[in-house]
């Protein structure tokens, strides 16, 4: 198969992966309205083409948390990467490291912190949920610090699991799920050999290290469901801020007031995110939420964004809407499932090339020159009437 764009990796991943794994990452919550809008809204952000600007000295470099990055991109935390490729977290981290961008290890990774961190040169980031088991949280933070992780990404939009109906049909959960997964693996021999057999153990490495026993897929679903904490508030984050002395990023912000609270709390960054449409269906797409948040806190805190980003053009759009850096999730996982480290490396090269084309044709020589002036109109004003936000008089 010819891979010429990030979308090609999605098609290839669907052929490679057992359905329960493909649909787990490809799907969203409820009817997947927000999942679709993440992509659709971003795709309709119209860029302002400029010409004859002498773009020979174009640069994608940016600075984030006192580090220079070759482009404003990092790999987002994605659970179960090690089920999508053999020791998937190690391969994805290696690709990010070679490119010089951050890799974020998920709490629910297959490969534990101690397996991934020594394989790369630059410090990785670590993502943590707020869980009932504060002992696990402290243990994870201590291990992340010991491994040299530089930045903590604290996910706050999962006080309760989202309702992901697709998982019940695909075999990730629901009746007879284990049997469905077995037969799906049999029908996908390449994955079964490379990952299913040779990619073992499939423990949730960070959780197994804490519990002192193996944890499989069923444990993942049950342990997380029982440990999400709906009582979470900003006060619960105070002891983490005291414990963690590196940059701390709050992931899951969609409202300007929550962004202001993050500034008051003393966070170093936020991620404008709806969890890729996997939590509450019907909330704003990240592209729609971002401009108001940028208006509220730009310059006071680093603004990262995810959800709906599929290519380099989308990266430029998010920067123009107000982000400082973006996180890639699904896009890199499709590439990882298709071709491992080489797939992720190629995806990052594609995104870099697409960004250079977009910046050249919008007259932005540097990342700092990408702004609202790079857009024809702000998102919402340039959308077709059917997609534009309803006025009060239009509301049913």
Swiss-Prot record:
PROSITE patterns: FMN_HYDROXY_ACID_DH_1 (PS00557), FMN_HYDROXY_ACID_DH_2 (PS51349). Its EC number is 1.1.-.-. FMN binds at residues 106, 127, 155, 251, 306-330. Its cofactor is FMN. It is a peripheral membrane protein. Substrate binds at residues 24, 129, 164, 278. GO terms for molecular function: FMN binding; L-lactate dehydrogenase activity. Pfam families: FMN_dh. Keywords: Cell inner membrane, Cell membrane, Flavoprotein, FMN, Membrane, Oxidoreductase. GO terms for biological process: aerobic respiration; lactate metabolic process. Residues 1-380 form the FMN hydroxy acid dehydrogenase domain. GO terms for cellular component: plasma membrane. The keyword Cell membrane applies. Gene3D superfamilies: Aldolase class I. It is found in: Cell inner membrane. It catalyses: (S)-lactate + A = pyruvate + AH2. The active site is at residue 275. Belongs to the FMN-dependent alpha-hydroxy acid dehydrogenase family. This is L-lactate dehydrogenase. It comes from Salmonella choleraesuis (strain SC-B67). The gene is lldD.
């Amino acid at each position: 198969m010819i891979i010429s764009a990030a979308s090609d990796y999605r098609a290839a991943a669907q052929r490679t992966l057992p359905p329960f794994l493909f649909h787990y990452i490809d799907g969203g919550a409820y009817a997947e309205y927000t999942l679709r809008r993440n992509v659709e809204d971003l795709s309709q952000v119209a860029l302002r083409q400029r010409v004859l600007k002498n773009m020979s000295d174009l640069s994608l470099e940016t600075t984030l948390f006192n580090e220079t990055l070759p482009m404003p991109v990092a790999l987002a935390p994605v659970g179960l990467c090690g089920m999508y490729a053999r020791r998937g977290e190690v391969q994805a981290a290696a690709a990010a490291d070679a490119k010089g961008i951050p890799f974020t290890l998920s709490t629910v990774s297959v490969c534990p912190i101690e397996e991934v961190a020594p394989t790369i040169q630059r410090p990785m980031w670590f993502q943590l949920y707020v869980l009932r088991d504060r002992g696990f949280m402290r243990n994870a933070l201590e291990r992340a610090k010991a491994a040299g992780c530089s930045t903590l990404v604290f996910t706050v939009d999962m006080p309760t699991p989202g309702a992901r109906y697709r998982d019940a049909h695909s075999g990730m959960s629901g009746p007879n799920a284990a049997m469905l997964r077995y037969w799906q693996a049999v029908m996908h021999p390449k994955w079964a050999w490379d990952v299913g057999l040779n990619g073992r153990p499939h423990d949730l490495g960070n959780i197994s290290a804490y519990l002192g026993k193996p944890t499989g897929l069923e444990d993942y679903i049950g342990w997380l469901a029982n440990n999400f904490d709906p009582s979470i508030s900003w006060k619960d984050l105070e002891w983490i801020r005291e414990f963690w002395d590196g940059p701390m990023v709050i992931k899951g912000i969609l409202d300007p007031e929550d962004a202001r609270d993050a500034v008051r709390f003393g966070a170093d960054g936020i991620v404008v995110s709806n969890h890729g449409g996997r939590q509450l269906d019907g909330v704003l797409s990240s592209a729609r939420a971002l401009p108001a948040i940028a208006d509220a806190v730009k310059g006071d805190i680093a603004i990262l964004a995810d959800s709906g980003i599929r290519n380099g053009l989308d990266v430029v759009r998010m920067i123009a809407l107000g982000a400082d850096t973006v996180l890639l999730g699904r896009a890199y996982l499709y590439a990882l499932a298709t071709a491992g480290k080489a797939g992720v490396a190629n995806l990052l090269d594609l995104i870099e090339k697409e960004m250079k084309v977009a910046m050249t044709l919008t007259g932005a020589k540097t990342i700092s020159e990408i702004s609202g002036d790079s857009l024809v109109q702000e998102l919402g004003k340039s959308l077709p009437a059917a997609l534009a936000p309803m006025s009060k008089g239009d509301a049913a």
